[in-house]
């Protein structure tokens, strides 16, 4: 690839001491070499920051390490990463996931080959301590209507032109966007006339366990509804469409955690995606 724009990989890290090395190593192993990794520790109480510092000391020219004075949640943390980023392109990454070695190479090539596209995501594999159990396939050409029935992009997989974050002023650091900062981003992304696409190839592995489901609390679902109301108004969706979201929120709130875990385990055993 002749033209190699710099990619800033932004990663908020919090209490991920046991998985962080694997995440960072997957970036170090990228076939695309013009990148910087920006880590921001969000007030971890384990050895996460110390481990990140070791990597920073070993790769001082490629890794930038920041630290919040206290736990400020993901939106604030990612905005700090964006402030430090110097790349033309911005990639997301989580501290407990894995990027395939050719992820950046293929996503950069896609953006360079599609100048009308400002963001590209990809399919991703879900895995746990037992191994990979399914692949999540995205809509390859999502638009603003996609948000009505599913997410247009898997947040941690995206590579974005810097102009997107500059135009949107980063992530919304408000209570209503807590744990749904990605959904808020998609609403504002489409409201500003941007276009995105997905590569239907798994270039990213996302780690899932019992804590992943437990974190999807009633409060986070309520925040999702608040953000949905905001987004539907922003994009001019009919008010009646909100009824579907309200009913979905009620249904999810009354289903107990054990039932959700049983359903997910059953899907894994049946090989369903």
Question: What do these predicted ranges mean?
Answer:
Residues 68-85, 106:
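Glycine-rich, basic loop-to-helix element that forms the pyrophosphate-binding segment
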Residues 90:
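Short aromatic/hydrophobic "clamp" motif used to bind/position activated sugar donors
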Residues 190-194, 214-237:
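Catalytic core of nucleotide-sugar-dependent glycosyltransferases
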Residues 4-7, 28-39, 47, 61-64:
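Short loop->beta transition adjacent to catalytic acidic/histidine clusters or analogous donor-positioning motifs
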Residues 1-28:
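N-proximal low-complexity "stem/linker" segments adjacent to membrane-targeting elements
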Residues 102-134:
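Conserved donor NDP-sugar-binding/catalytic core segment of glycosyltransferases
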Residues 41-50, 70, 94:
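A conserved acidic beta->alpha catalytic loop
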Residues 83, 143-218:
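Conserved nucleotide-sugar donor-binding catalytic segment
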